[in-house]
Amino acid sequence: MIQQESRLVVADNSGAKEALCIRVLGGTRRRYASVGDIIVVSVKSVIPSSDIKKGAVSKAVIVRTKKEVRRPDGSYIRFDDNACVLLNAAGDIRGSRIFGPVARELRGTNMKIVSLAPEVL
């Protein structure tokens, strides 16, 4: 459950370490985003000598949330952190690696993220 001003870990090797959610996409009154949703983020911290700069605005897809997500079989999945993967203007992921596990809910729309992830829960 991510909303404006939520801080997220960036789970790819694009060069960004932390991002701040500045908008949840998908409607004018939409307040929260969950796993698989696309948000607009501002990069808050980067690794030295990275292509991405601090303050850069980018779209991102959420891959992990602390708030549990209910599955159709009645089970729940939750993670230890809130994490996202940065996207470019075309909607493809910016990095070439994904760090940490990702949720199975990404299979429908983000197969590239699922194929690069070390573990899908």
UniProtKB/Swiss-Prot annotation:
SUPFAM superfamilies: Ribosomal protein L14. It comes from Porphyromonas gingivalis (strain ATCC BAA-308 / W83). Belongs to the universal ribosomal protein uL14 family. One of its GO terms (molecular function) is structural constituent of ribosome. It comes from the Bacteria. Keywords: Ribonucleoprotein, Ribosomal protein, RNA-binding, rRNA-binding. CDD domains: Ribosomal_uL14. Binds to 23S rRNA. Forms part of two intersubunit bridges in the 70S ribosome. Pfam families: Ribosomal_L14. One of its GO terms (cellular component) is cytosolic large ribosomal subunit. This is Large ribosomal subunit protein uL14. GO terms for biological process: translation. Part of the 50S ribosomal subunit. Forms a cluster with proteins L3 and L19. In the 70S ribosome, L14 and L19 interact and together make contacts with the 16S rRNA in bridges B5 and B8. SMART domains: Ribosomal_L14. InterPro entries: Ribosomal_uL14, Ribosomal_uL14_bac-type, Ribosomal_uL14_CS, Ribosomal_uL14_sf. Gene3D superfamilies: Ribosomal protein L14.
